[in-house]
């Protein structure tokens, strides 16, 4: 399940993020990579324990908790503190094919999560850089993702993925992981489809429609059956 989530941040918020990030110090992005990923990773990253990363990351989490599409798709239990990276053409930055670590731990908070879902939030407009596509592989093939600034993509952390070399400009983004209340990706996808159908039905017929009420009850009972909290 690969889901695009538009307008997580407004254009004004993106501009503010970029001002703060441009004024911050950056470090080698391999500092947060696993052993295998570090061999194919070349980019820069805001220090995860730095004030800028922590403050901006919390703002992203706050925005996501107000986003109905995200909540419906992810059914999040825990969200890992967002990280921030930059790929520049002058360095030949890229990130080769890899899979994310199954478990992530935050040394500052002690939080440990199972990485069910990964998210990339784009913070540079696609016409400001060449290359830098996020390529995600699944059972249906390869998908290239390059979204407007402020938009995000959500995908299973079990997916092989890569960032192609940046050949002009700079690709700036936030990336992070989350543990879902619904461990099984297939079940989570069906829950999302059901919720989407319920929302469409209630828009047409109203929330008091008997079928909409019944389906909403089924949705919550399925969450009750499958959720791990």
Swiss-Prot record:
Coiled coil segments of this chain: none
Positions contributing to 2-oxoglutarate binding: 171
Domain of life: Bacteria
Organism: Bradyrhizobium sp. (strain BTAi1 / ATCC BAA-1182)
InterPro entries: Oxoglu/Fe-dep_dioxygenase_dom, PKHD_C, PKHD_hydroxylase, Pro_4_hyd_alph, Pro_4_hyd_alph_FE2OG_OXY
Residue positions binding Fe cation: 98, 100, 161
Cofactors (names): Fe(2+); L-ascorbate
SMART domains, A to Z: P4Hc (SM00702)
Domain (Fe2OG dioxygenase): residue spans on this chain: 78-180
GO biological process: DNA damage response; intracellular iron ion homeostasis
Keywords: Dioxygenase, Iron, Metal-binding, Oxidoreductase, Vitamin C
A GO molecular-function annotation: L-ascorbic acid binding
Enzyme Commission number, as recorded: 1.14.11.-
Cofactor note: Binds 1 Fe(2+) ion per subunit.
SUPFAM superfamilies with a match to the protein in the record: Clavaminate synthase-like
The protein's name: PKHD-type hydroxylase BBta_3541
